Amino acid sequence: CFESIKDAQEYMPEFLDDIIKRNLNCIKFFKTPDNQIPFFNGGSQTSLVQFEKYLENFKLIKNRKKNCIGGIFYAKSKQQVLYFDIGNPPDKNFSNNYQSGPLSFEYFLDGMKIITNCGFGNNISTKAELISRLTASQSTLTINDTSITKFERNKLVNRIFGNSIKNTFKAFDLEIKNDKSFVGCSSLHNGYEKNFNCIHKREIYIDPGVNGLIGIDHIFKKSDGIPIR
């Protein structure tokens, strides 16, 4: 779009130029070592090789100074890369591709994906697409095979909004750590509060010293904060 307007020697509105640059920066932020995007919230196996060539020609500087964009935390140390979903679910009107995987993650080592999340089911059966959105399909903790987010099954509603979500949750208490020992963060979500009266906390860190990944899941009682053993 930007190049087409430029070649046509048309006036580029400042707001449009800003929107294009912001979107390109997001693509740069999310591009994985294998030239794809993380498999969160509608992400599927899509090569960005040709798109990356365009970005290089566009001479856009990759900005990795931010730790988080769009609810996805990013960390890198040497040959390790971590993507961590710490965001809240979108508004119902924009949730037709949402995957119910709060605190799910993907991990790369030496350019290879070691831990993957479930990609969104494109061009498959309706049932398989729904399965690809359930919590049990994601790289996160599940309790009693329960999907944290419920999906709308009403055909009329789905015709208007797509297969949108019916309920929501909150992610909170993000704590980022970035020192010589560990690079990563911890976060909580209350998706299991209504049915199980508990809070899920996940800590996940890259260890630069040993090229390793360290993580731990906590389940706390909502009423008193005591860990469930």
What is each stretch, according to the model?
Residues C1-I20:
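Aromatic-lined, polymer-binding surfaces characteristic
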Residues D18-N35:
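Long, well-ordered core segments of solenoidal/helical folds
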Residues I5-Q9, K31-D34, D145:
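A generic secondary-structure signal for well-formed alpha-helical elements
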Residues F15, I19, G43, R133:
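Short acidic-hydrophobic sequence patches enriched in Asp/Glu that either
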Residues V49-R229:
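Catalytic and substrate-binding regions of extracellular carbohydrate-active enzymes
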Residues D34-G43:
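Glycine- and aromatic-rich loop/turn segments at beta-sheet edges
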